[in-house]
């Protein structure tokens, strides 16, 4: 074979001219270069794809880590709201503005609604700004007052402290009036009527309230609250019927089905109660203090109380007992030796009058005894909710 017949890509036909041979060899050389380039590009693409896979893994890892931190932040919030918010801000999971914190609470995913309520009710300047931003996330336009309250009271659980409730309901009333101009003469009117509706809900759907308020009584109770004038009777009747037909749905965080009867208790917890029968035995009961009554249950999940002690006309005192520590008593200071007006449920379901001259109760610790005595004294002496309403009604009356 001719020496020119060798080279890249095999032999060259002998019948080609020198010029054609050179052109063919040039084509073969460029083909090889292209094949080499393609192989190099394949290698580079493979490297890039590997880098992309690594980056994706890193991003997924970051997302997983972020989700874990958010979940941790929610848990911290449910245990201590201020520390939970601080943790989320420090880890760049939440901006430090009141608006961002309000949005986080409003979404509420994985958050305890009782804790949300306590946090929003705090009087720190930042918390007040968060409350304002939180309320502004609610759209109440074209809703009647009951519809707006349903939406508002589902987004958190009202705290038990009167001052906290006052701030939150004041913010609600201002927002409702802003969204619905002309419905009420003032935010005070909206505030007073909102409380009247909440109390109506409790009265209508509390199994222990025998004398259920009628629409006429509800209308009469709210006369003169609109800057001295009356609200339209049709409006009040519609609000009454709405609550009568469907009670408020209150968020339940503890699994107990007590929300209709025991709306925002002043205090609740386990205590020991000395029996009133011939054989005096101590029994552990779950106590709930609300609406100037002390209710006790056998279990936290019971729907009906085992006993009800109205606190009207009673007093409370600390006592020593040789068998149990941290004791206090409820007694009637005006009629010593007289059986206290109360009722209890027997094992067969019958409701009978109590037979206690005094109710002796033992708390788990000295601190809890002091807290219970303080709460019961406050409940006996005055109801802060009625104080707040009385203040608003006086303010309305003074505007006449």
UniProtKB/Swiss-Prot annotation:
Almost absent from liver, thymus and peripheral blood lymphocytes. It is found in: Cytoplasm, Cytosol; Cell membrane; Cell junction, Adherens junction; Cell junction, Tight junction. Keywords: Cell junction, Cell membrane, Coiled coil, Cytoplasm, Guanine-nucleotide releasing factor, Lipid-binding, Membrane, Tight junction. Residues 264-381 form the PH domain. The keyword Membrane applies. Residues 14-61 form a coiled coil. GO terms for cellular component: adherens junction; bicellular tight junction; cytosol; Golgi membrane; nucleoplasm; plasma membrane; ruffle. Residues 77-206 form the SEC7 domain. Residues 392-400 are annotated as: C-terminal autoinhibitory region. It is a peripheral membrane protein. GO terms for biological process: establishment of epithelial cell polarity; Golgi vesicle transport; positive regulation of cell adhesion; regulation of ARF protein signal transduction. GO terms for molecular function: guanyl-nucleotide exchange factor activity; phosphatidylinositol-3,4,5-trisphosphate binding. A 1,2-diacyl-sn-glycero-3-phospho-(1D-myo-inositol-3,4,5-trisphosphate) binds at residues 273-281, 285, 296, 306, 355. InterPro entries: PH-like_dom_sf (IPR011993), PH_domain (IPR001849), Sec7_C_sf (IPR023394), Sec7_dom (IPR000904), Sec7_dom_sf (IPR035999). Binds via its PH domain to the inositol head group of phosphatidylinositol 3,4,5-trisphosphate. Interacts with TAMALIN. Interacts with ARF6. Interacts with FRMD4A. Interacts with FRMD4B. Promotes guanine-nucleotide exchange on ARF1 and ARF6. Promotes the activation of ARF factors through replacement of GDP with GTP. Plays a role in the epithelial polarization. This is Cytohesin-3.
């Amino acid at each position: 074979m001719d020496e020119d017949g060798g080279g890249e890509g095999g032999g060259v036909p002998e019948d080609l001219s020198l010029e054609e041979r050179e052109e063919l060899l040039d084509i073969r050389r460029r083909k090889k270069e292209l094949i080499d380039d393609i192989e190099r590009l394949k290698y580079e693409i493979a490297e890039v794809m590997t880098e992309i896979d690594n980056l994706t893994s890193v991003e997924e890892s970051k997302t997983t880590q972020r989700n874990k931190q958010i979940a941790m932040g929610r848990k911290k919030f449910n245990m201590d709201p201020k520390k939970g918010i601080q943790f989320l801000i420090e880890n760049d999971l939440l901006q430090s503005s009141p608006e961002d914190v309000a949005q986080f609470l409003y979404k509420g995913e994985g958050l305890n609604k009782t804790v949300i309520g306590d946090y929003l009710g705090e009087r720190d300047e930042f918390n007040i700004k968060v409350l304002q931003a939180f309320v502004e996330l609610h759209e109440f336009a074209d809703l009647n007052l009951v519809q707006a309250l349903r939406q508002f009271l589902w987004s958190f659980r009202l705290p038990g402290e009167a001052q906290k409730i006052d701030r939150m309901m004041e913010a609600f009333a201002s927002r409702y009036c802003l969204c619905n101009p002309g419905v009420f003469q003032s935010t005070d009117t909206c505030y007073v009527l909102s409380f009247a509706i909440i109390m109506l809900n409790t009265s209508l759907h509390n199994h222990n309230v025998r004398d259920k308020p009628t629409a006429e009584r509800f209308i009469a109770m709210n006369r003169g609250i609109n800057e001295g004038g009356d609200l339209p009777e049709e409006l009040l009747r519609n609000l009454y019927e709405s609550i009568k037909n469907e009670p408020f749905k209150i968020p339940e965080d503890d699994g107990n089905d007590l929300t209709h009867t025991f709306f925002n208790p002043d205090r609740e917890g386990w205590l020991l109660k000395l029996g009133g029968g011939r054989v005096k035995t101590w029994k552990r009961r779950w106590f709930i203090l609300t609406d100037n009554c002390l209710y006790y249950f056998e279990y936290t999940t019971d729907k009906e109380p085992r006993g009800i002690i109205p606190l009207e006309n009673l007093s409370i005192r600390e006592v020593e007992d040789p068998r149990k520590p941290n004791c206090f008593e409820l007694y009637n200071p005006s009629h010593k030796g007289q059986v206290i007006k109360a009722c209890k449920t027997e094992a067969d379901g019958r409701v009978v009058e109590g037979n206690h001259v005094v109710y002796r109760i033992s708390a788990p610790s000295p601190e809890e005894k002091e807290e219970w005595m303080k709460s019961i004294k406050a409940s006996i002496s005055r109801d802060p909710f009625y104080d707040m309403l009385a203040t608003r009604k006086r303010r309305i009356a003074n505007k006449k």
